[in-house]
């Protein structure tokens, strides 16, 4: 959520920055709401002053034996009380309308984010590794994976399209990847591992910005009868739960940064993605991801963003996978981000790079929603900055390992860094 004081003091500048990311901020609507709010507040202050003045007169009138005049004054105070209640209701209505609108407004892009309308105008930062030149006809991960235990028909039979069953060697490789990622982040990068719920309420999703904007992208569950019926949601990413662990908190500054990680399934309806990536693991309703979250001092957040990109890169390097880093342009950034880097891994069968990690700085956008603060060196409570990044998407990493490390006979070479997690197995072979 944007800072309302910033909106009030720099409305035109905020509107201009939002326009850079393709959001049309309705300044006329905002000005009208502000006028209504100010009008009600002025009326409230006038009523309160009048009530206080008349209340003082009542005692004096009674002391002078002027009971009829005192009664008239008491009737006036009673009417003022009614008027104040109405003014409070009017102010509450204006504030609720303003708050609901603020929840739908995206974050402001950082000044150094490249301007662009969509993903075609993202900017490549660097490429790492050289895509392998194969001397045989390559297969995609579906054809490679099915003989090794990747079962798309089984997933569809159980749950419908975009679900997958894994068994045997593939299931073990999938688990090994997640464990390797977690160990790297906890043992080498200093994150604390978490296990968090997979089902959350709407307040939690509002805190990280998924609600109310992206309700159609979420899976929800309903429980209880008619009177006690409640709706909750399956998490689209562990960013939601990890970040919300500090909701409502005041963190001593010496405890920052907080570095959190978790391996979890993620559930997404993929609304608007009909017909895209219908083959294979690239786009699933349920997929696993190892998430990184950092809660930091505001002055450290952009330094931390670069650090988190490096943490994700370390996984790709260890797995010997070619990749590139790109800066998302203003028109392609996520709702809550001020700046985002995507890491894209080389997918040989598609002859292109595909997203495998997204690392974002949200500055105080999420913290303001969650009321997540820290106490600075002067004892003042200030909003923290929050960052999140994939470290990595496990299914897409599996795709990359299968395709980049395939052999002509359909076997898969296991990267050396991953072999200890596979019981020393150096190659997956069709049995």
Curated annotation (Swiss-Prot):
It is found in: Cytoplasm. The keyword Lipid metabolism does not apply. Keywords: Aminoacyl-tRNA synthetase, ATP-binding, Cytoplasm, Ligase, Nucleotide-binding, Protein biosynthesis. GO terms for biological process: selenocysteine biosynthetic process; seryl-tRNA aminoacylation. Pathway: Aminoacyl-tRNA biosynthesis; selenocysteinyl-tRNA(Sec) biosynthesis; L-seryl-tRNA(Sec) from L-serine and tRNA(Sec): step 1/1. The keyword Aminoacyl-tRNA synthetase applies. Coiled coil: none annotated. It catalyses: tRNA(Ser) + L-serine + ATP = L-seryl-tRNA(Ser) + AMP + diphosphate + H(+); tRNA(Sec) + L-serine + ATP = L-seryl-tRNA(Sec) + AMP + diphosphate + H(+). ATP binds at residues 268-270, 355-358. It holds the Pfam family tRNA-synt_2b. Its EC number is 6.1.1.11. CDD domains: SerRS_core. GO terms for molecular function: ATP binding; serine-tRNA ligase activity. GO terms for cellular component: cytoplasm. Its main location: cytoplasm. L-serine binds at residues 237-239, 291, 390. Consists of two distinct domains, a catalytic core and a N-terminal extension that is involved in tRNA binding. Belongs to the class-II aminoacyl-tRNA synthetase family. Type-1 seryl-tRNA synthetase subfamily. Homodimer. The tRNA molecule binds across the dimer. HAMAP family: Ser_tRNA_synth_type1. Catalyzes the attachment of serine to tRNA(Ser). Is also able to aminoacylate tRNA(Sec) with serine, to form the misacylated tRNA L-seryl-tRNA(Sec), which will be further converted into selenocysteinyl-tRNA(Sec). This is Serine--tRNA ligase. It comes from Neisseria meningitidis serogroup A / serotype 4A (strain DSM 15465 / Z2491).
């Amino acid at each position: 959520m944007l800072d309302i004081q910033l909106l009030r003091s720099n409305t035109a500048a905020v509107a201009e920055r939002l326009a850079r990311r393709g959001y049309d901020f309705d300044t006329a609507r905002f000005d009208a709401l502000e006028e209504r709010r100010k009008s009600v507040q002025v009326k409230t202050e006038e009523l309160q002053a009048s009530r206080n003045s008349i209340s003082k007169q009542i005692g004096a009138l009674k002391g002078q034996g002027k009971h009829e005049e005192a009664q008239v004054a008491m009737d006036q105070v009673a009417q003022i009380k009614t008027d104040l209640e109405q003014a409070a209701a009017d102010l509450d209505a204006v504030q609720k309308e303003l708050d609901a609108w603020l929840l739908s407004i995206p974050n402001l892009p950082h000044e150094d984010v490249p301007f662009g309308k969509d993903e075609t105008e993202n900017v490549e930062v660097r490429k790492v590794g050289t895509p392998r030149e194969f001397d045989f006809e390559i297969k995609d991960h579906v054809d490679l994976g099915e003989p090794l235990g990747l079962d798309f028909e089984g997933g569809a039979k159980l749950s419908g399209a975009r679900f997958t069953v894994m068994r045997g060697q593939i299931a073990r490789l999938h688990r090994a990847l997640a464990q390797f990622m977690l160990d790297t982040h906890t043992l080498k990068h200093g994150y604390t591992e978490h296990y968090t719920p997979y089902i959350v309420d709407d307040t939690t999703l509002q805190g990280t910005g998924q609600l109310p904007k992206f309700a159609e992208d979420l899976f929800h569950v309903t429980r209880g009868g008619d009177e006690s019926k409640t709706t909750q949601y399956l998490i689209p990413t562990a960013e939601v739960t990890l970040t919300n662990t500090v909701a409502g908190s005041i963190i001593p500054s010496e405890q920052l940064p907080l570095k959190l990680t978790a391996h979890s399934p993620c559930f997404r309806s993929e609304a608007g993605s009909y017909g895209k990536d219908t083959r294979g693991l690239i786009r699933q309703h349920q997929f696993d991801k190892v998430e990184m979250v950092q809660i930091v001092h505001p002055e450290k957040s952009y330094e931390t963003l670069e650090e988190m990109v490096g943490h994700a890169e370390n996984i790709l390097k260890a797995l010997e996978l070619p990749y590139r880093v790109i800066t998302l342009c203003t028109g392609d950034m996520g709702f809550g981000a001020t700046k985002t880097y995507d890491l894209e891994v080389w997918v040989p069968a598609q002859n292109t790079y595909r997203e495998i990690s997204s690392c974002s700085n949200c500055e105080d956008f999420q913290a303001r929603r969650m009321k997540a603060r820290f106490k600075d060196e002067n004892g003042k409570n200030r909003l923290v900055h929050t960052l999140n990044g994939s470290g990595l998407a496990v299914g897409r990493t599996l795709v990359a390992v299968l395709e980049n490390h395939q052999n002509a006979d359909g076997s898969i070479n296991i990267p050396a860094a991953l072999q200890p997690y596979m019981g020393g197995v150096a190659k997956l072979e069709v049995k």
